[in-house]
Amino acid sequence: MTRLSHQDLRRNFRQLLASDTCYHTASVFDPMSARIAADLGFEVGILGGSVASLQVLGAPDFALITLSEFAEQATRIGRVAQLPVIADADHGYGNALNVMRTIVELERAGVAALTIEDTLLPAQFGRKSTDLITVAEGVGKIRAALEARVDSEMAIIARTNAGILPNQEIISRTKQYQAAGADGICMVGIQDFDQLEQIAEHLTVPLMLVTYGNPALRDDKRLAELGVRVTIDGHGAYFAAIKATYDSLREQRQIFTQASDLSATELTHTYTQPEEYILWAKEYMSVKE
């Protein structure tokens, strides 16, 4: 079987961005899931930062995973992946210089694209965990990412949260990220097509949405018309794997013979123990939710 190189996969992803179709990502978190996604015909995969934290650390999504840990997981996936994989690179693991290091490591890992978000991470003392950095800092990160990139086929996508600022501010941010050279804009927090249309009409680069399966956005034709080329609908495959593991091990121990009535979300909550992290953040950092 002919294997596609990392550059082949990056070119394939560029073709998706240049198309007039909206594609849905498969959540890939290890080599096996990447192979399964490709075998089932998914055109693109996503390695989520939250899923990587669960997979590598068994910890909730509190920006605890390091660049090295994330890049190692991306490398494992990149060795076998035969579909383009987008890496959710969070905030680039620091300032603009850290972003440059992030680009080097993830390009070497073989990802086809990556997102750099403008959330203030990790949570800062006395600040809300959803605060955004300034536009100027966000632009600096995108420019630094482009400078650090060697393979121009690897897409650099700027990500922002459209759910916590007025539309006009989101339009201003995304236009500046576009002007800085971002290959695409990723948005989380879009509520409906009215909001999406108001923002999208000001942008010319391909769009990517984190929808988490929002029913108000379930119209691929309309999404495509508005420039959306990729949607991230969540990481259901990963949580289903947690549920299946729990049920299988419990049955093996013969404690019960029927499947658990706990949901995957409840199981994830139980075994990542987020209450401890929330307590520590409040105690030592005065983080405000």
UniProtKB/Swiss-Prot annotation:
Gene Ontology terms, MF aspect: magnesium ion binding; methylisocitrate lyase activity; oxaloacetate decarboxylase activity
GO biological process: one example: oxaloacetate metabolic process
Annotated catalysed reactions: oxaloacetate + H(+) = pyruvate + CO2
Keywords: Decarboxylase, Lyase, Magnesium, Metal-binding
Binding, Mg(2+): D88
Family under the similarity heading: Belongs to the isocitrate lyase/PEP mutase superfamily. Oxaloacetate decarboxylase family.
Name of the featured protein: Oxaloacetate decarboxylase 1
Organism: Pseudomonas fluorescens (strain Pf0-1)
